[in-house]
């Protein structure tokens, strides 16, 4: 029988008793209690339900029943209630939930009290109820919400209890932001699971605390010898006292800190012991510690580092070591590098979790463990001792000798006189006998022919142990100076000092080959006490000056600058050549061909202004010439100038004309057209210079070039503009290079002899340029366009009587339709409706306008073409499909036009299609770049897509918006080139006049500015911000500051004085469009990937993939690339392109192009670019002048080593790095046991550097340095931002893309693939990306998997997290990326990177091929080989 509980006794719920009859036993109950009649019982139940629900009509379940069923489903125990009577107020109950663990049989309980109850006020949501049953049901509702607030159970509750549920929901949401931890504890969907996890966490903490206490006890046991006079102290106690004393001085918190959970989930990396020793040995030889000291100029810096000193003492470094470290720029790195592992404070000790070594010392055989323990007495770690033992075939003697030699690698043994084993043993034993006789009783533990020990200081238990090595005495013996007593300890840093000075003594005395042990013992007896009393600095002055004489920077720089300037020195033409040119010109102007071309030129409107233009240019230094489209200004103005120079001045060589164009196609086209008009071959009198092609010669008078080329030329030789008329065309486009050229020209105007500036544009803000150039002279050329009739949206809607279905009117606002004359099914939208003013496109209306214009032209017997302007490729494809479906194919030839099409497809728009109306559906490419001669009508949606840069998160976003009035005018002008035209605008006249901006936003205000900053800096301009503030439109200051910070992060700008670093100077020498590409070229040469890096940069330089465009090919292209999926997007494209260039046969090449969907034009552009890059690299001296592809094997030694290629790509594109976060491991049960499951692609997360966090961090650092105000670290945003792989990537592998994301992406990029496969990125901790794209999410494109060591060696700055309390968790890259590793690994990699920078400088300033080089590059080569070995070791 169930035990009665308190609430059962107080419950007023009736019991269904069975009525009794005479002669039968009465039913159980209280004495004398009569059974209730059935009707009374039912009435009482109804009364109770009414009380609980506050209504007599409720027929659903009651809260207690719902709670009971919920607990039953979760396999919890029966719910119990703790009932309390609150005086006369009534009853309050608390539901008590419980769960019994089926394994341990332990029962866990959870009391579900009122979470809103406030002890101070004694008030809460639950008030005392009249009866116990009401109180019990109220407690059930409270418990239900607390364990199931995320469900819809409230829909099953009575109305009054539903109100309680809602009140609890409001309470939880209101307090969630302010006290998330407490709220999550109160409202827990599975409180018993949380209890178990809390127990485990508590147990783990207790275990760590016990381990910490045990470690502290161990440290206090060994007494450290600090003086030869018997000064012995407990190292643990000594450190602890210093910690307490120093803690008071440390009050500045570290800005960069991460919680324990973040460190637990961070990437782990370790160096194997051989790599660690390789790096350390190399660094000991090369580090110039003198250069790392704080100079006298920086005394103020030294004075402001008291907080840092206090922090180092708090970390328990010895005071004398801290004093020495404070002399250096990076004291912590100095200490971590120079202190032996054993003497590092406990905070930096190596834990078991800090290593990936497969061989654990504790798992070794006992004999091996004992050898390792003996070898550590030299002053090395167990790992170092084990590695030495393994490298010497487990021979203890040879391992001891090896470790001794490593202390002073420069000490050379006399290997020219090898000693036989017999001679070595004989010499060893003779010396032992002599020592025994001289120092009686001092020799002990002698093992025949192997080793022995000598007593040095009896009082301190210090002894000398020597090991015989083969070839002794011609080689060093193994030398150990130690206590050999676990109760006494000689600090390792003192051991290191003793042995270092001892070996220097042997080296200086040239004693190797003599009786070494005798000399060693004698020297130690005399000097060891002095060294123990005064060990001296960790770095003696003699060692700190080791690398000073190796530097010779100025000569190298001078030679590079000289070589780079040779190309751009201005050549003079001889008198003989001038005579030939004069004679050739005289003949040419008399030819019939020239005269016929003259007649063609005279038909252009510009011809009438020839004299005015020449006169205004002669009289003014700066001229602005505006002209309508088709006026001939681009082809004629430069010819007017040249004709005047040749005819009037007889100038055939002195004055040059440079004409810049914003696009390559324009520069080439104009050069060829002007050459034809002047009846010369392109490249002679008239030529062009674009990236990759220089089609000019010394006698060329008119040079067309892209604005970017002129910017790069001006970086190296401004004198090239002497006696030059610079014509800057299309200034209205306001590209970043055009704005920079205009600003530079203004600065150079009075500094360069004989230079004039001519600005040209179709539509431009004349007042802006007059303000920028005081005294600017202007001239306007009228065009020859025909009258154009304009129709705005209100006219179109009226003429077409356009209607929409009533159900579609929801897309428009309430007042946007004209209700007059509307029938029940259709409505008439107005031009000022929200739909149209927001820029949305009604494709039904667009198609009807095309049909309407076609019929109107047909009625006028006009066979001209129609251009439809749309914002993007997705919109063009949609419109083309609709037009093809709705129209009669016999009437229309619908042609798309955008930059992604092949040149062949683009050329289709120029053809005539007899009997059909040509309808060109285009982006703004048809606005200026391409002219369709037979166009008579334009239909303009008034929309365009432009890239906008957001410096806050360092991303660019493709934004669709209304175009400017100037662009509307340009589009309109396309309709009046051949006859009277029509211009239909799908926007209202009011929107055009009042909402559209006058001119387009300059590019300098909407793109990243790193390349601009570097270009300006390379010209010798110190204050870039001040210089650019004088531009036509100053760039946004936040974008400029972001550019400066990014260039500092990637190592091109020095953080202290904002000057170009060595690497920055090298990259600025190369006229490369992007600093990332410049870094890739330099790294490629140094690491033996020259040809492949040049090809990669050429592919990246074209800006798009080298495939035939179009959405119909997207999946085919991805399928081709997926053959190389494991290497990522860039290498997949590289392999396909490289295979093409390997083919020699032309027919096979053509087939390869077709099979792999490669664009012939883009491949040719890549080929042209590679030639240009080789020319640049030769010119600046990075490659020999006679270099041919693949001709020097060392420059291509790693061309098939994708590990090295990945690493240099990482260095080139940092900080474009994303961390790959895998989900928690899941296991699958099989017959052979549990097997780890591959993670689902949709569960993998990608994190990139948060630019908002970096900006805020800089702001806080400034505030702290200025001590202006306190900073709240809680306000710092998260260091990382989540990103997603773009579906076009070969690494994208999921079928879980939600429909909304897929729709948004398809609007920009077309349909996406939804195939699923095991993701490659699982194998790599990071991926690098070249570009990113923001739609509804941040997507990463062109991905390449990469490794942790690649990131550490080539990525951002490395710092140490010293904010922990027990142990250093690891290092932090660039303030945002925590990496778990032993601190010593961090400092070794950090110093190796410094040596790598030095190696880059040496190799580039004095290349190996330079025969006259006097600089020894062997050290640089060794550094590069070490880096290559480290990268290979991670695989």
Swiss-Prot record:
* Domain Helicase C-terminal intervals: 845-1020
Q: Does the keyword Calcium apply?
A: no
Residue ranges, annotated region (Disordered): 1-57, 226-251, 543-566
Motif DEAH box boundaries? 729-732
Give all residue intervals belonging to the RWD domain.
Answer: 430-531
Q: Which domain of life is it from?
A: Eukaryota
Name its cellular compartments: Cytoplasm
Residues covered by the UBA domain: 365-406
Keyword entries, A-Z: ATP-binding, Cytoplasm, Helicase, Hydrolase, Nucleotide-binding, Phosphoprotein
In the record, the note on similarity to other proteins reads: Belongs to the DEAD box helicase family. DEAH subfamily.
What further fact does the record state? Present with 195 molecules/cell in log phase SD medium.
Protein name in the entry: Putative ATP-dependent RNA helicase YLR419W
Give the species this sequence originates from: Saccharomyces cerevisiae (strain ATCC 204508 / S288c)
